[in-house]
Each structure stands twice: as structure tokens, then as C-alpha cells.
Amino acid sequence: MTNKIYNLDKTNIKDGVQCIKKLWFNFHEPIIIKDNPEFHKGERFGLIVRENYGNGLDLSDNFNIQDVVIKTEEALKSKNTNVIYEGAFIFEKTLVRTDVLIKNRDGWDLLEAKATTKIEEKKNVLKKEYLLDLSIQTFILKQCGVNLKNI
């Protein structure tokens, strides 16, 4: 059994809101799907996001969560880092990974990038699950002391 530095992550929380049994199975009988097409679609979309926001610290290929948390903390303090891709934050043993953090004049902007093929009729309305996603990230980042200015 591995000794994880976190118990919950954003996906577990969202799954638990959707269905408590799903959360239970995620913890007690997890299924690991290595060739999930959705995962690969997300990888490709991540490349497009990085092309649009330019050079920055890209932590997307690092799956050692403790290492990613440390590198994210260092990048937040660095004067040379303006963009962080796939940063990691842990508060109260709850993990979130952010898609993009962009340094602005007096803090950081949080960008949640979504790869979707559905076109919403109401263009300016965020889907409920996106709001939950951003709410979880915002709470954890603020608890970790990140000065968020725009979400």
C-alpha cells in the first residue's frame, strides 16, 4: 500500500457530489484505465493551451505529487515564472491540480481549460460542474496562500 500525501482530489469530490457510491468505489475498488480516449484528448488539448499561453513551467508530465507541489510553491515565489501549467496544491490532504496559473501585476489568474465538443446555447453560462471544479480549486489555492485575482 502506498503512503499518499493526500486522501481526496478534485475528481473524488466531484464524483461524490454526483453519486456517493461512485466516491466509495473510487476509494475502495478503483479501476485504472490506461487507454482512455478522454485522457488522450485532454493531453492534446493541453498542448494547444500551452501554445496559446506561451512558455512557462510545465509540470504536466510530472506525476510525483510531492515534487509537483514543491515545484509549484517555488514557481509562485519566483520572479522568473509567469505561467504555471498543471501546478499542484494540497490543503487538508485534498489535492488539486490547476490547468494554468498566469502571473499578473499583483497576484495570479486561474484558468481552467475545458476541451468540449458541445456548443452551449447560452454562451455566457458556465456548466454546473465547471463551477464546482473552479470552486474547489479556488478554495484550496486560497487556503494555500495564493493571491488569486481573476478566475
Protein language model regions, located:
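Mg2+/Mn2+-dependent nuclease catalytic core
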Residues: 76-151
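Metal-dependent nuclease catalytic cores that hydrolyze phosphodiester bonds in DNA/RNA
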Residues: 1-107
